[in-house]
């Protein structure tokens, strides 16, 4: 595996633009792809605004903002977006057929060392990989919303994902200043299943008269459950 320098993010929606911001801030030459030029323009504007907020909060300086924006380019041709990149992160809507179509097209265009990652929060990485000639290079990189704030990264190992790819993605995650959890491919992975368990327990408390639903909701907001779990245990709700 060559040293990773460039990243292509596929999809410029809420998650894609957040991932692109993290990637560019972390020093990677980053291409952000979407079929809609208007969405791309909006994404770049939002990323720049988020970086300005970071400056106001003294999280970064003007030079770091300028460098991040200089590393970020937009592309509305998928084949061009992935040419000679080291890592592809797909962040399109959660439809298996769409993801398989994209991975099939991308796998035919990228170099043999390129890692193909999906930001899916629940779809099978092994099933996504099945439509490619290189399932050993397909992995899950599940970022959490908003990606530039929530540092958790759930790395999902497919049935055929190589350990070298897992190790490389771990290192990428560290370079992106993420808090890492590595899981095997299973329905919902770890984060979504834990989120469901938390939600079910809240329902039981209401059913058993332990708390009223307003109280459960209020406590969840007060203690910021979705982020407290992430900070304390390395897990989070998405």
How should these model regions be labeled?
Residues 21-25, 32, 66-87, 168-177, ...:
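Amphipathic alpha-helical segments at domain termini/boundaries
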